[in-house]
Amino acid sequence: MAKSALHLARMSYQPKMPASLQGAVKIIEGKATEAVSDKEEIAAIFPRTYGLPLISFAPGGERTEYPPTNVGVILSGGQAPGGHNVIAGLFDEMKLLNPDSRLFGFLMGPDGLIEHKYRELTAEVIDEYRNTGGFDMIGSGRTKLDKPEQFEAGLEILRELDIKALVIIGGDDSNTNACILAEYYASIDAGIQVIGCPKTIDGDLKNKQIETSFGFDTAAKVYSELIGNIQRDCNSARKYWHFIKLMGRSASHITLECALQTHPNICIVSEEVEANNYYLDDVVTYIAETVVRRSEAGMNFGTVLIPEGLIEFLPAMKRLIKELNEFLSQNDAEFKLIKRSAQRQYIKNKLSPENSRLYDSLPVDVARQLIADRDPHGNVQVSLIATEKLLADMTAQKLAEWAEEGRFQGRFSTLTHFFGYEGRCAMPSNFDANYCYCLGRAASILIAAGKTGYMAAIKNTADPVSEWEAGGVPMTMMMNMERRSGKMKPVIRKALVDMDGEPYRALREMRREWALSTEYVYPGPIQFFGPEHVCDSPTMTLRLEKNDR
């Protein structure tokens, strides 16, 4: 492939590692663990992988002869910067433990395992992708891996290739499936270990043991650069309000982090909206009031950051979406027979009275998007809902009403943006390059230790890399029971913005000042070379959360 000058320079970057991942490693097992909630139900579903101990690595173990081990790897779900470095770290540690070990990448996500499509990942292949963005080394996919017939189809190719361990790199849903697969293979004594690695730019796969998911650092910095560019333009022209929607279907971590980096005039946090039982009109009124106050100070411009999943956090909308999800999952075949022109009336007649009235009141585009095709996990595809345009239009309408009443004499012109794909395959920051490489090395060590049902984990990530701690976390420890597609299922719990956490508190303390003044920060592009405080610094979220731990 053709390479840019920066690409060539990044290929030679050697990721940093803590001492616990260098040389001989000692495995330290902690106490038995239990699920975050619904303990009895989770224990019953995962009898062979429940209650496993936490694992930490320490330097100074005895050098051991390891047999050659063939390993498979899958990239699952949406892309996130750093996935290639997870594979590179996995490969390098495998070869260090035994040069005769082999790594196979299943193509286009779980489908590659099920359909027996793969490629061997040699040093020549992997060296082309070190420190690069994207998942194009082997591709990714969103197929759910949760059925016994899929597990058996995968087992055929695993046995054919003499693969003893499978690494699944993905988000909470993908690692939930990895946990189910680990339990299934253990239940039939298949001799296949399953290890997970935490990936999602949304930042919603984290807990006390998993401090961050890879890709979040890079994506937040990419979006923050773009927001900073827009804010500089905004402060130069001084005639537009920019409504900017950011990735984050289930949580507002990206929006919050970008706000901390760029100081917008308004930052909507979905979790705050839900906690205060706000309605859509409450959010619109808050934005409009800020527009009025800035206009009175001679500032007919500003920026609004909006999380992708806001609609799902509005309590009334949440109830509507829940009923829609359950109804459509149970009546999918019948719904598909309804003409598109008649679908809205059909849905309205099937909903409860309260939800029917709300659904009928929605703009045509939003109502249509709520019943559009679901993702493979049965969820409304909220990224298709143009929340940024909806809020901009509703704010304009409210301001027009206020103007007629004499409450607003300013100007209000809007531009809308959605930053999503721009950050998914960016060249990983130094933080993500280091973090992902360490995750891959940790996954390989867990395999060598004979573990299954674990997720590779790195702690102390707000500190310099030399102080990071590596290990493994039982995936059942993160599980709870949730309703999915109308049924209660075990899933890894998503991490929402903590309303008592330091990152949110920092926003809350500054948001009024940001709203009434113009204190934009312009982060600029990700830096790969130069002083460590410029190139290697973690996110504001990680640094602030360090105070909570």
Curated annotation (Swiss-Prot):
Pathway: Carbohydrate degradation; glycolysis; D-glyceraldehyde 3-phosphate and glycerone phosphate from D-glucose: step 3/4. Its cofactor is Mg(2+). GO terms for cellular component: cytosol. Its EC number is 2.7.1.90. This is Pyrophosphate--fructose 6-phosphate 1-phosphotransferase. NCBIfam families: PFKA_PPi (TIGR02477), PRK07085.1 (NF005482). Keywords: Cytoplasm, Glycolysis, Kinase, Magnesium, Metal-binding, Transferase. It comes from Porphyromonas gingivalis (Bacteroides gingivalis). Belongs to the phosphofructokinase type A (PFKA) family. PPi-dependent PFK group II subfamily. Clade 'Long' sub-subfamily.
